From Swiss-Prot:
<dbReference type="InterPro" id="IPR036653">
    <property type="entry name" value="CinA-like_C"/>
</dbReference>
<dbReference type="Pfam" id="PF02464">
    <property type="entry name" value="CinA"/>
</dbReference>
<comment type="similarity">
    <text>Belongs to the CinA family.</text>
</comment>
<dbReference type="InterPro" id="IPR008135">
    <property type="entry name" value="Competence-induced_CinA"/>
</dbReference>
<dbReference type="InterPro" id="IPR041424">
    <property type="entry name" value="CinA_KH"/>
</dbReference>
<dbReference type="InterPro" id="IPR036425">
    <property type="entry name" value="MoaB/Mog-like_dom_sf"/>
</dbReference>
<protein>
    <recommendedName>
        <fullName>Putative competence-damage inducible protein</fullName>
    </recommendedName>
</protein>
<dbReference type="Pfam" id="PF18146">
    <property type="entry name" value="CinA_KH"/>
</dbReference>
<dbReference type="InterPro" id="IPR001453">
    <property type="entry name" value="MoaB/Mog_dom"/>
</dbReference>
<dbReference type="Pfam" id="PF00994">
    <property type="entry name" value="MoCF_biosynth"/>
</dbReference>
<dbReference type="InterPro" id="IPR008136">
    <property type="entry name" value="CinA_C"/>
</dbReference>
<dbReference type="InterPro" id="IPR050101">
    <property type="entry name" value="CinA"/>
</dbReference>
Length: 413
């Protein structure tokens, strides 16, 4: 049995985005003992995609196509494969109902290109999209089996884990159940984490370990097999324990769809506490990230964006002379912002951000210098200084995530 992966997308072909999906899929095939000797990348072009499919058929009996299932005119994968197999596209009622609900919620009309997301080649088995709208498919056609998977990683990974891997295990004669656990880490680079886990990775058999980096955090996927889910879980626990023994101080939560913001809101809920923030260089990004989490309004009533010294003094009632004396980029300002914001919002915990996003220096401090303040009810405020690498947006994003990690650890203490 041989599998071939075809990544579809002009952005991948042009080097604008990295083909992380192909690497992830290849690791899963290896874990199942399925040989894969070739991968292809094809742009959003129907004729060239069909050529790639024909080439894959000539040397593999499992063809996995990733990407091109969305609603835009250049999303041609399912149409191209359906035409190649001489099958029409039919509608999945469940996917269409989900799509209609989304369209209604957004108060916009249903368009034919949107409807395509709920279509699949006739005779295929549906692979449910737990995150997005475009359905995947498992298609058996003679001696070949074809798989359609969405391109966005947040949709692709859950579909592979929950929908595809059980089918692949059966298809390959791998009778055991595969179970994966995703561990999320922040504050450590992938290279350092891999170094820390070097012997575990080098000696892995079952469970297997795979690491990924995205948006300044690292995820570790640990996968084990067993006759039952309980058996697989029993294999996972010692490996997860070994990982946590080495890098547990950077761990913040489990799950594909988790985030620091979600984990922070969950912990606020568990403690029945409210949070606020006072932001300078991050310009409200911390509060915006909190606002993306459903149900946050119970634990976050509002906050402050105080970019200039004058607004810090006016909105937060901080003595302007003290601010001028210590400077914007200082421990004093970070502490004062956090504590005054907490008092004004009557919150239990508060985070503040002040510093130099760049590219220019400020008060003699280089770009990337960030002070983050933390204030808790009944405790003295504290401030932490960081020197983040990267451009302006990277500095701001790292600051927001670091502030979330600080607040999370304070709530867990």
């Amino acid at each position: 049995m041989q599998a071939e992966i075809i990544a579809v997308g002009t952005e991948i072909l042009m080097g604008q985005i990295t083909n992380t999906n192909g690497a992830y899929m290849a690791k899963q095939l290896t874990a199942l003992g399925i040989d894969s000797y070739h991968q292809q990348v094809v742009g959003d072009n129907g004729p060239r995609l069909e050529e790639a499919i024909k080439l894959a058929e000539s040397r593999s009996n499992l063809v996995i196509l990733i990407g091109g299932l969305g609603p835009t005119p250049d999303d041609l994968t399912k149409q191209t494969l359906a035409a190649h197999l001489n099958r029409k596209l039919v509608e999945d009622p469940d996917a269409m109902a989900k799509l209609q609900a989304r369209v209604k919620q957004q108060q916009r009309p249903m368009t034919p290109n949107n409807q395509l997301q709920a279509m699949y080649p006739e005779g295929a088995d549906i692979l449910v999209n737990r995150v997005g709208l475009a359905v995947g498919a498992w298609i058996v056609n003679g001696q070949h089996t074809y798989v359609l998977l969405p391109g966005p990683p947040k949709e692709f990974v859950p579909m592979v884990d929950h929908e595809l891997l059980p089918r692949l295990a059966k298809w390959s004669g791998h009778a055991e159940i595969m179970v994966s656990r995703v561990l999320r880490f922040f504050g450590i680079g992938e290279s350092q984490l891999v170094t820390d886990l070097d012997d575990l990775i080098a000696n892995q058999t079952d469970p297997t370990i795979a690491t990924y980096i995205k948006d300044h955090e690292v995820t570790v996927r640990v996968t084990a097999s067993g006759a039952t889910e309980k058996d697989a879980d029993a294999k996972l626990e010692p490996m997860i324990g070994a990982i946590m023994d080495r890098d547990g101080q950077y761990f913040y939560g489990y799950g594909d769809d988790n985030s620091l913001a979600k984990e922070l809101v969950k912990t606020l809920a568990a403690n029945d506490m409210q949070i606020t923030a006072a932001e300078s260089l991050t310009a409200g990004a911390f509060q915006a990230a909190l606002g993306d989490v459903p149900g946050v309004s119970t634990y976050f009533k509002g906050g402050f964006v105080t970019y200039s010294l004058a607004t810090k003094a006016a909105f937060l009632a901080i003595d302007a002379r003290e601010l001028a004396a210590h400077g914007v980029v200082s421990a004093f300002t970070a502490k004062a912002m956090a504590e005054h914001a907490r008092r004004k919002a009557a919150a239990d915990i508060s985070v503040s951000f002040t510093g130099v996003a760049g590219p220019d220096t400020l008060e003699g401090q280089p770009a990337g210098t960030v002070w983050i303040g933390l204030a808790r009810r009944g405790q003295l405020p504290e401030a932490h200084v960081y020197h983040f690498p990267g451009g302006r947006n990277d500095v701001r994003q790292r600051a927001v995530m670091t502030g979330m990690m600080l607040a999370l650890r304070a709530l867990q203490a």
